[in-house]
């Protein structure tokens, strides 16, 4: 009686060892070659194998089939799937690219140099193309020079630009009509698609500069217009309070204000 019990247990143990019992797990980058997933109640014996195929975007790591083999300790996987690679991305003119990798699912970020703007998408992804080859999608963008429209017109003045568009870094020069003074920078710069602030043309006439107990030491003129400079000195016995020089400025005023001669 005791021997029969041992024999039964031994046979039962052999039966469990010979069976892996359930279907193996499926790696996320593979699929079963045959429809074993629907046979959830199937039992597999030691030595049985189940084949896998790589999902799109993946390839076999080495030659030969990919399969799991039932062993005494469970399923053992032979071979595996690894990500396919896209071709090396090409550089773009007047721009840079930040490569996050060249494997399936990786991305590239594009940016343009100063003075250029991106035409197209700023990111491309490594994907499986319609022909089965690995491609970057969407295609690489281009970096196009930022352009300014024709520079703005100003009252009582003009500029020397006659183009429809201007590239980044272009400079256009303004001048004023006769009798007007140019206030600001005569040249405007195209930068980032915008012009720097243009000057204005104004009539600037300052009154004759006179100070009590003092006199002009330089800058004698019958009339004074924008940016004319004058210098002052005091008579003997007086000393200068304030700046010794002044400039005719917008608003028909002297700046800094005229000095005084004090005892």
From Swiss-Prot:
GO terms for molecular function: complement binding. Its main location: virion. Residues 1-19 form the signal peptide. Disulfide bonds join 21-70, 54-81, 86-126, 112-143, 148-190, 176-201, 206-248, 234-261. GO terms for cellular component: extracellular region; host cell plasma membrane; membrane; virion membrane. PROSITE patterns: SUSHI. It is found in: Virion membrane; Host cell membrane; Secreted. The keyword Protease does not apply. Keywords: Disulfide bond, Host cell membrane, Host membrane, Host-virus interaction, Inhibition of host complement factors by virus, Membrane, Repeat, Secreted, Signal, Sushi, Viral immunoevasion, Virion. The keyword Secreted applies. GO terms for biological process: negative regulation of complement activation; symbiont-mediated suppression of host complement activation. Residues 20-83, 84-145, 146-203, 204-263 form the Sushi domain. It comes from the Viruses. It is a peripheral membrane protein. Pfam families: Sushi (PF00084). Heterodimer with A56 protein; disulfide-linked. Serves to protect the virus against complement attack by inhibiting both classical and alternative pathways of complement activation. Binds C3b and C4b. Belongs to the receptors of complement activation (RCA) family. This is Complement control protein C3. It comes from Vaccinia virus (strain Copenhagen) (VACV).
